């Protein structure tokens, strides 16, 4: 197996709202990584690209949409996403490409533009929850993070103040990172005083939503050695996914991280990680998550090692176990897919002596980066190492400042040309017989489970297979008691989109272990009829159902769980075996649903020039000095050579008259509804330029327009639907 090294890195600034399009952000990071590696795009054999949920951009298969900016045009190309775990999964995929011997070099790119999504980027996470059993409760990631944080605190005895120390350290470390979005000198008191979102989570416990991109170049040993500098090797990789049924396990310990770490350690020859690793970059979207993930990386289910290190100050940049010297997601920012790759880049800087003011104390020869994603289930881990004495390289990166990095921060998308999109997507999700049986239980005022004899588990929600017993078929179903015990809870002040609830209103979400189903077989739902101050882990509760004539066979037929009264504790009811529902065309159920997200897309650096020209009735392109061509429409990068371009400084005027080279007559809108009149959509090419422009053709002629000479129609409207042409003459 070929050894694989990181030989170059690039990144944009991480910002709340970027003017650049996703492709422009990716191209900026790629150009920097190629320059750092001393290579051109022609030297790259393959490209791996990571972006997280498509719901952030509202563009299906978003990776393919920005392939040009990622340098993947006409190259072997792979796109993948596992939520926040993507940024470490991406270099793992790139490592596979090179380690296999098939490729000598691989460009790894991770990009995320979260800002287009409204009413808030966090609202996009509604799409990762089960559409039938969880989305109706209007959960968001803040809620399940808060549930996990509360369980973590309960299991390991942490206080909120102790956890807040992580946020303080990481934000301070970020003061020295050129890409950092929110570097700050704050105190534990500042964290504790910040706005409460969903107890125990406060504003300063959380990383920001971000736009940004990161790229690295991977190379075989032969290519890396030929560069004449000490390589930084990928020594071990690991990746594991746990079940999406996140209420079926104790949230206190990240088993998926520990398993991935064990795989990486075995590959790297590590037997004592606490002694053999010099730099730690765990994923830290919330401050408690850094400690949570460190428990997994140290393979310590007791949590004593991490607590001891925290109390000793070992996680400081000058400590014995420096954690997130970069500043992590909490300080640098969290453009979901790109965050993990930022951590990989940090290890490259640290282990090659290029980290500048962020360089950890002592010689660092080995580091570990880890990322996490989706429903608290993804673990991705990479171990990296250098060889020989630590080289201190006075590179560009050693002295880089924020103003040296690309990435244009906006106060508002409305400040630049942009396009609004309201998809209004609707769905009908089929249930199948197991889920139908489960939901019919709600209609009957019952909590139902399926039983696996292989592992002796009552499974909630009921399912036709066991995910831990080799997909063993399950055909036994039970009605369970509608009582249980609170395993963890959160008192929320925000809704599904992370927007404030009405004044005085809170929602209390809890994971309830249902009686008869085991300690860690929980059901997430609301609590009611209880003072928030009286809620605690271990609280005994009972379901409160809607009146029978109002039930619809949905999880919301259970209104909430209330505290169980002492006089109701007269012996636990036993599970009762039932027959599963037999499906027919009449009884087969489905769940209607809608994804309530809207988008506002910036036109980008190239688009800003294009729409300014359009308003004046003119057309310009962008000159690429490397390829010696004019690109149309205006562009911030050249798709062929990945050279960064300035659409303003390198603008070249073009004749606004062009020739139609392709056309189609459209009779329906994008939703399939008939148009009042058919519309010609044409592709137009222009003399002395590479590329073309799509738009409407305004004409009364029904003849096919291919070969027709047309000109741009001036308009001040922004958006592809406003680009139009008319015949010349």
Language-model-derived ranges and their functions:
Residues 516-572, 687-729:
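Well-ordered alpha/beta subsegment
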Residues 483-529, 537, 657-698, 706:
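Glycine-rich active-site loops that engage anionic ligands at enzyme catalytic sites
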Residues 1-23, 27, 32, 132, ...:
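Condensing-enzyme catalytic core mediating Claisen C-C bond formation in acyl metabolism
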Residues 81-112, 142-176, 216-222, 335-356:
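Active-site-proximal alpha-helical scaffold in enzymes
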Residues 440-483, 612-657:
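Cys/His-rich short segments
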Residues 53-109, 113-144, 183-208, 240-242, ...:
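Conserved catalytic cysteine-centered active-site region
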Residues 1-85, 93, 152-159, 181-187, ...:
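Conserved active-site "lid/cap" helical segment
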Residues 389-447, 549-620, 718-722, 728:
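A broadly conserved sequence feature marking short terminus-proximal activation segments
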């Amino acid at each position: 197996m070929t050894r694989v090294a990181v030989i170059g890195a690039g990144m944009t600034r991480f910002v709340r709202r970027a003017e650049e399009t996703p492709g422009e952000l990716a191209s900026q990071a790629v150009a920097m990584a190629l320059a750092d590696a001393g290579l051109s795009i022609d030297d790259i054999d393959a490209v791996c690209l990571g972006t997280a949920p498509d719901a952030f951009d509202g563009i299906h298969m978003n990776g393919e949409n920005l392939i040009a900016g990622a340098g993947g045009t006409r190259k072997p190309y792979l796109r993948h996403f596992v939520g926040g775990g993507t940024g470490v999964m991406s270099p793992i995929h790139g490592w596979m490409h090179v380690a296999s011997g098939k490729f000598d070099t691989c460009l790894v790119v991770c990009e995320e533009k979260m800002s287009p999504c409204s009413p808030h980027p966090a609202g996009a996470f509604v799409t990762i929850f089960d559409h039938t059993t969880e989305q109706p409760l209007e959960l968001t990631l803040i809620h399940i993070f808060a549930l996990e944080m509360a369980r973590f605190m309960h299991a390991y005895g942490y206080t909120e103040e102790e956890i807040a120390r992580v946020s303080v350290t990481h934000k301070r470390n970020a003061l020295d990172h050129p890409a950092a979005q929110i570097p700050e000198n704050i105190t534990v008191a500042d964290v504790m005083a910040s706005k409460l979102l969903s107890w125990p989570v406060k504003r300063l416990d959380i990383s920001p939503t971000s736009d940004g991109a990161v790229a690295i170049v991977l190379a075989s040993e032969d290519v890396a050695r030929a560069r004449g500098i000490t390589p930084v090797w990928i020594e071990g990789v690991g990746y594991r996914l746990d079940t999406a049924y996140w209420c079926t396990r104790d949230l206190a310990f990240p088993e998926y991280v520990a398993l991935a770490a064990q795989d990486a350690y075995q590959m790297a020859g590590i037997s004592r990680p606490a002694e053999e690793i010099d730099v730690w970059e765990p994923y830290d979207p919330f401050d408690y998550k850094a400690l949570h993930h460190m428990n997994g990386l140290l393979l310590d289910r007791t949590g004593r090692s991490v607590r001891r290190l925290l109390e000793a100050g070992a996680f400081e940049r000058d400590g014995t176990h420096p954690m997130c010297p970069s500043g992590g997601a909490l300080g640098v920012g969290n453009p979901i897919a790109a965050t993990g790759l930022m951590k990989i880049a940090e290890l490259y800087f640290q282990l090659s002596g290029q980290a500048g003011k962020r360089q950890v104390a002592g010689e660092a020869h080995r580091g570990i980066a880890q990322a996490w994603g989706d429903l608290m289930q993804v673990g991705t881990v990479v171990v990296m190492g250098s060889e020989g004495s630590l080289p201190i390289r006075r590179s560009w990166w050693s002295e880089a400042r924020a103003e040296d990095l690309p990435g244009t921060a906006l106060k508002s998308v409305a400040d630049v040309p942009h396009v609004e999109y309201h998809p209004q997507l609707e769905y009908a999700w089929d249930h199948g017989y197991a889920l139908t049986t489960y939901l019919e239980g709600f209609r009957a005022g019952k909590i139902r489970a399926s039983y696996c004899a292989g592992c002796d588990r009552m499974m909630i929600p009921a399912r036709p297979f066991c995910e831990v017993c080799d997909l063993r078929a399950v055909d036994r179903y039970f009605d369970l008691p509608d009582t249980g015990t609170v395993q963890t809870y959160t008192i929320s002040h925000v809704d599904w989109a992370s927007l404030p609830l009405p004044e005085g209103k809170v929602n209390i979400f809890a994971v309830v272990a249902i009686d008869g189903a085991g300690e860690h077989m929980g059901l997430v739902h609301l609590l009611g009829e209880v003072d928030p101050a009286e809620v605690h882990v271990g609280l005994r509760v009972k379901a409160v159902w809607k009146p029978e004539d109002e039930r619809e066979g949905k999880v919301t037929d259970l209104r909430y769980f209330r505290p169980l009264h002492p006089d109701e504790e007269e012996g636990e009811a036993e599970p009762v075996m039932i027959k599963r529902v037999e499906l027919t065309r009449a009884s087969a159920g489905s769940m209607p649903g809608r994804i309530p997200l809207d988008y506002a897309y910036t036109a980008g650096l190239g688009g800003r020039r294009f729409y300014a020209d359009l308003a004046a009735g003119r057309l310009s392109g962008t000159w690429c000095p490397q390829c010696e061509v004019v690109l149309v429409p205006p562009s911030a990068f050249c798709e062929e050579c990945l050279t960064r371009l300035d659409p303003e400084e390198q603008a070249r005027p073009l004749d606004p008259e062009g020739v139609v080279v392709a056309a189609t007559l459209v009779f329906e809108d994008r939703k399939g509804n008939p148009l009042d009149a058919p519309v010609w959509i044409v592709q137009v090419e222009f003399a002395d330029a590479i590329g073309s422009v799509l738009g409407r053709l305004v004409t009364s002629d029904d003849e096919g327009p291919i070969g027709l000479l047309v000109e741009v129609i001036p308009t001040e409207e922004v958006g592809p639907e406003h680009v139009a042409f008319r015949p010349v003459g």
